[in-house]
From Swiss-Prot:
InterPro entries assigned: ATPase_NBD, Bacterial_glucokinase, Glucokinase
Stated name of the protein: Glucokinase
Cellular component aspect of the GO annotation: cytosol
Subcellular location(s) of the protein: Cytoplasm
Alphabetized SUPFAM superfamilies for the sequence: Actin-like ATPase domain (SSF53067)
PANTHER family to which the protein is assigned, alphabetical: GLUCOKINASE (PTHR47690:SF1)
Binding positions for ATP per the UniProt entry: 11-16
Keyword Methyltransferase found: no
MF-aspect GO terms: ATP binding; D-glucose binding; glucokinase activity
Entry EC number(s): 2.7.1.2
Pfam families from the UniProt entry: Glucokinase (PF02685)
Swiss-Prot/TrEMBL keywords: ATP-binding, Cytoplasm, Glycolysis, Kinase, Nucleotide-binding, Transferase
Lineage of producing organism: Bacteria, Pseudomonadati, Pseudomonadota, Gammaproteobacteria, Lysobacterales
Length: 335
């Protein structure tokens, strides 16, 4: 069996969890469902150890891999933004006995997944109806998603090929759009100095917003986790409800700015671990109002679809799409 016909080990590595699967890149639905596993990254000293453990658990071997990591990839090295792992591509490949290993940014993988998503993998959160593009159609998409941090990327489709945009856009400065948000920025600046979008739009960001909302109300916020904030909001707690409202509005404003920055008129995909959990809030909040409220471009923005990705393993799917694209670039393979 040739290397290109063997399953590829794909991974989606975040600051909290590591997900692995085998993928058959010849298929439109490449993930082998019975091979998908999730592990806590804190349980392993390195990515190589986690990958080797996974292969042992499923009783499989692989000679190639595509690992999507939540951090910047710089040549041979990647650093997980919210975890102390420092990953060397060459050392990890040698540890696993791989002939080929690609390290890509996790939101490059989220972007690549768009090329394999179907209509039932997404839920519309406003804008014109989205129809998956036909092969060869040019498309520009943005991708943004809150989880442990805030990931930002994009995808350009040209001539049947996918070109992901790897960015660290979650770390751009937070631009408040209301007097309340200006006050939130002031409060968070006292703790963090510079305040990035990720300080608000992610799991820990919910807690940060809640603390600021409580401070403005003269209320002790307590020691809460993100899940506590959303649970309190569901039970009618005023500060928690306001926190969710602010979160959704700011998320919409940032997503709209991303569309303008990238020229992503074909749509923005909302991914990350929080998006499915907060879907109802996003659909019944100021998300789209702030998304569309872009001055002279408001009428154009009203047509841009925003789509919540509901596929449970979009990062793995995108890593598989990247592997398939890499195979087309391999020597001796016709484009």
């Amino acid at each position: 069996m040739s290397a290109s016909s063997q399953p590829v080990l794909v991974a989606d590595i975040g600051g909290t969890n590591a997900r692995f699967a085998l993928a058959d890149t010849s298929l439109d639905a490449p993930l082998q469902q019975d091979s998908i596993r999730e592990y806590a990254v804190a349980e392993f000293p390195s990515l190589g150890d986690a990958a080797r453990h996974h292969l042992e658990q499923i009783g499989a071997t692989a000679s190639r891999g595509v690992f999507a990591v939540a951090g910047r990839v710089d040549g041979d090295e990647a650093r997980i933004t919210n975890h102390p792992w420092v990953i060397s591509r060459s050392r990890t490949a040698a540890m696993l006995g791989f002939d080929e290993l690609h390290l890509i940014n996790d939101f490059a993988a989220q972007a690549m997944a768009i090329s394999l998503l179907q209509s039932d993998d997404v839920v519309q959160v406003g804008g014109a109806a989205w129809v998956p593009g036909k092969p060869g159609q040019p498309r520009n998409y943005a991708v943004i998603g809150p989880g442990t941090g805030l990931g930002v990327g994009g995808l350009i489709l040209r001539h049947g090929r996918c070109y992901p945009l790897e960015t660290e856009g979650g770390h751009v400065s937070f631009p408040p759009g209301t007097p309340e948000e200006i006050r939130i920025l002031e409060i968070l600046s006292e703790q963090f100095g510079r305040v990035s979008n990720e300080r608000l739009i992610c799991g820990p960001g919910l807690v940060n917003i809640h603390r600021a909302v409580c401070e403005m109300a003269g209320i002790d916020p307590g020691q809460l986790q993100p899940v506590d904030v959303t649970a309190r909001a569901l039970h009618g707690d005023p500060q928690a409800m306001r926190t969710v409202d602010v979160f959704c509005a700011v998320f919409g404003a940032i997503a709209g700015d991303l569309v303008l920055t990238q020229g992503a008129w074909d749509g923005v995909f909302l991914t990350g671990g929080l998006t499915p959990k907060m879907l109802d809030s996003l659909q019944h909040s100021g998300f789209r109002q702030r998304f569309e409220h872009k001055g002279r471009f408001s009428s154009i923005m009203a047509r841009v679809p925003s789509l919540a990705v509901m596929h449970p393993h979009a990062g793995l799917l995108g890593a598989a799409a990247y592997a398939a694209d890499a195979e087309r670039d391999a020597p001796g393979v016709a484009a």
